[in-house]
From Swiss-Prot:
Its cofactor is Mg(2+); Mn(2+). Its EC number is 6.5.1.2. This is DNA ligase. It comes from Pseudomonas putida (strain GB-1). It catalyses: NAD(+) + (deoxyribonucleotide)n-3'-hydroxyl + 5'-phospho-(deoxyribonucleotide)m = (deoxyribonucleotide)n+m + AMP + beta-nicotinamide D-nucleotide.
Length: 776
């Protein structure tokens, strides 16, 4: 037998032993025999180095150290999950799923423990592991290929056959409790750093630049799903996981089906009771709608899937003493109390600070400085004060007082009453917030505003980290975001961290930031409660900064996922004279927003008179009543002028009286007319609806999306089609105009072929969009 033949035999045998040991939990040989085979292979490869291949079991020991990790863009974003902390949260999730699917019978869910580790992506091409990456921010992660190759139960080559040419496997790298204990014991014996908990140990081990260190750590991998795949590998989530297991991927041994939310709750309770006896740390349970077609139908909300949720376990709690309460100043000027605690370990982490949120929370707790309190890590991450232990209160405990002057700049601190709004009306009190009135004259607010403005997801000005921003502010070089565009080379060269080359690069990055998208610019402004997704909705729907600035709160609620609270935050931000001045300065610096344009067509055609009436919050008049009213009185002016007789012909007496009473108030008349006038000015008034719809190229057509699209998500594809006037349906029928089919298309594609419906693959679809002036 040749050395090459024996090497191939040994690799195949060792791969099979690894599969049986790590995936099936059925060891086929004693450890000593495995070690003998491994050492034989290692010796043969040393004698014949030209026969060493990347997928050999001997190549898990690590290679040369890296200087830094390179970035990897996820073709399919690695989204985070929404959380449920109470049974009511999970039941509400179940209700939304049932409502979204509109199907009879219990929904089938997959259930598994939520490992407390680090999410990673493993990319296989033709069965070979070619890349490993961290989750990062969900869009961009770090290339940790060398490190994941050292994790013992990650197959370097897939088992069996039939795997797709491209297969991205996603899962969690973690450290078992036993492995963690062994690692810490070894670290302590060697005089090295010990880790607070298994998650920190796993994360720190996986992100080592020297993969030899990673190889020495007891890391494990558990698969929980897939990302990009070149062809379908199943029609259910559990089916996909079972197929991955057949190809050598370790999956959770606790994976189960559940028929409906009550069975999910039973699973959650069972895992919770066994939590401490499990060989690994978990912080909850993950439930996913099992049927993949149902997942696609439910889709996503912002950066979370609507078909999955993580039900978290209650956090671990400890007692400690409040040594002091200090006040921090945030980006919006909010003065927030923070408890300084006698250090205590909670769930393996030393906690010395805890959030107190606001003064109302301090009042609710009855907290005083010197008190003994119960703290917990909410969601196992953020320390919170839960309760004061009154029987341990010392005689010298002191009440907490809000500073009258800002602890940073000395400006006055004002108390602002918060209110909960209901469709334009101020209702119940939501407590109060204390704010420093110094705005950008306050160093803390200015620094946080600039840090947010230059961040990667905002204006993406490379070279300006927190320390650099603090230095520029402390040196008096910037007093607002607009001052960044006035910086000169001579001002920054020589500052700490800025040599000639880095100074030039920073100025180039600042100049490059003058061409942002509208969404980035809106997000960079730091509007309270406006994150990336909301900024994208504003930009995509309204199309221009001017419309966003002018929009009334009630008009903003017509946009997807924007409620009245957020709408008022947006409106109030742009009404503020100081903010207007900052925006004027930014635009005067040469800022050119790159994608301003018209109102989104689907948004322009989405409003109706009935919808507007329903949003006015007239007592007892909901969407159905509004439809009845508009069927009788087809204009706002007719409704305002209607007497009781006209109104009672459309509505029940109680509703008719409510409408008449509402419009007796001149302020309500003005509000309704202002809303209508703005809708008309924006081109989204119902009188424009027919004209807008008829003028779109796909008006009256029904399209269907199926399979996995690689160049865009299905939600984005749906938005593109709807912007052209098409209706996007979930099933194929004789009325379907066209089907867009990506890899993995199944029954819908077959149905289209059967009915003779036109089918476009993704390339043809992208070409079609380009012909309509839409670039992907």
């Amino acid at each position: 037998m040749t050395a090459e033949t024996r090497i191939h035999e040994l690799r195949a045998e060792l791969d099979q032993h690894n599969y049986r040991y790590y995936v099936l939990d059925e060891p086929s040989v004693p450890d000593a025999e495995y070690d003998r085979l491994f050492n034989e292979l290692k010796a043969l490869e040393a004698e014949h180095p030209h026969l060493v291949t990347p997928d050999s079991p001997t190549q898990r020991v690590g290679g040369e150290a890296l200087s830094a990790f390179s970035q990897v863009r996820h073709e399919v974003p690695m989204l985070s999950l929404g959380n449920a902390f109470e049974e009511t949260d999970l039941r509400e999730f179940g209700r939304r799923v049932v409502e979204g699917l509109d199907q009879p019978g219990a929904v089938d869910y997959s259930c598994k423990p939520k490992l407390d580790g680090l999410a990673v992506s493993l990319l296989y091409r033709d069965g070979q592991l070619v890349q490993g990456a961290t989750r990062g921010d969900g869009t961009t992660g770090e290339d940790i290929s060398a490190n994941v190759r050292t994790v013992r139960n990650i197959p370097l080559k897939l088992q069996g056959e039939g795997w797709p040419a491209v297969l991205e496997v996603r899962g969690e790298v973690y450290m078992s409790k036993a492995g963690f204990d062994r690692l810490n014991a070894a670290q302590a014996e060697a005089g090295g750093k010990t880790f607070a908990n298994p998650r920190n140990a796993a994360a720190g081990s996986l992100r080592q630049l020297d993969s030899k260190i990673t190889a020495s750590r007891p890391l494990e991998f558990c698969c929980y799903g897939v990302g990009q795949v070149s062809e379908s590998i199943g029609d259910s989530h559990i089916g996909v996981l079972e197929q991955l297991k057949a190809w050598g991927m370790p999956i959770s041994r606790e994976l189960r089906h559940a028929a409906g939310i009550e069975e999910c709750l039973a699973y959650y309770r069972d895992i919770g009771e066994r939590r401490n006896s499990l060989p690994y740390e978990i912080d909850g349970v993950v439930f996913k709608v099992n049927n993949l077609a149902a997942q696609r139908e439910l889709g996503f909300r912002a950066r979370e899937p609507r078909w999955a949720i993580a039900h978290k376990f209650p956090a671990m709690e400890e007692l400690t003493e409040v040594l002091d309460v200090e006040f921090q100043v945030g980006r919006t000027g909010a003065v927030t109390p923070v408890a300084r605690l006698k250090p205590v370990k909670v769930a393996g982490v030393t906690v010395s600070n805890a959030t107190l949120h606001n003064m109302d929370e301090i009042a609710r707790l009855g907290l005083r400085i010197g008190d003994t309190v119960i703290i917990r890590r909410a969601g196992d991450v953020i320390p919170q004060v839960m309760q004061v232990v009154l029987e341990r209160r010392p005689d010298d405990a002191r009440p907490v007082e809000v500073p009258s002057a800002c602890p940073v700049c000395g400006s006055q601190v004002e108390r602002t009453q918060l209110v909960k709004r209901s469709k334009g009306k101020e209702t119940t009190s939501e407590g109060a917030v204390y704010r420093c009135v110094g705005r950008l004259a306050c160093g803390a607010q200015l620094k946080q505003a600039i840090i947010h403005y230059v961040s990667r997801r905002a204006m993406d000005i490379d070279g300006l980290g927190e320390k650099s921003v603090e230095q520029l502010v402390d040196e008096g070089l910037i007093g607002s975001p607009a001052d960044l565009y006035k910086l000169a080379f001579e001002q920054i060269v020589g500052l700490e961290g800025f040599a000639e080359v880095s100074s030039k690069k920073l100025l180039d990055a600042i100049e490059a930031s003058k061409r942002p998208s509208l969404a980035r610019f809106i997000y960079a402004l730091g509007i309270p409660d406006v994150g990336e997704e909301t900024a994208k909705v504003l930009a995509r729907s309204l199309g221009s900064l001017a419309r966003v600035q002018q929009a009334l709160p009630q008009v903003l609620t017509y946009l997807p996922d924007i409620g009245l609270e957020v709408a008022y935050e947006i409106h109030n931000f742009f009404e503020d004279e100081h903010n207007q001045k900052v925006i004027e300065q930014l635009l005067a610096s040469g800022m050119k927003l790159q994608d301003e344009g018209e109102l989104a067509a689907e948004f322009a055609a989405s409003t109706t008179l009935a919808g507007m009436i329903a949003k006015l919050d007239i007592a007892s008049v909901g969407p159905t009543g509004a439809e009845k009213l508009v069927a009788k009185l087809d204009s706002l002016e007719k409704i305002i002028a209607a007497d009781g007789i006209d109104l009672r012909q459309a509505l029940a007496a109680k509703q008719a009286d409510a409408v008449r009473e509402f419009f007796k108030d001149e302020a309500n008349q003005k509000l309704a007319r202002d809303i209508e006038a703005q809708l008309l000015a924006f081109g989204m008034h119902w009188s424009c609806e027919k004209k807008v719809a008829e003028g779109l190229p796909l008006a009256g057509q029904t399209w269907v999306l199926t399979g996995t699209l690689e160049r865009m998500s299905r939600d984005i594809a749906k938005d593109k089609l709807e912007s052209l006037g098409a209706k996007v349906a979930g099933s194929v029928s004789g009325k379907t105009h066209c089907v867009v089919a990506g890899p993995g298309a199944g029954s819908k594609l077959a149905k289209a072929s059967e009915l003779g419906v036109k089918v476009l693959d993704e390339d043809a679809f992208v070409t079609f969009l380009a012909e309509q002036g839409i670039v992907v």
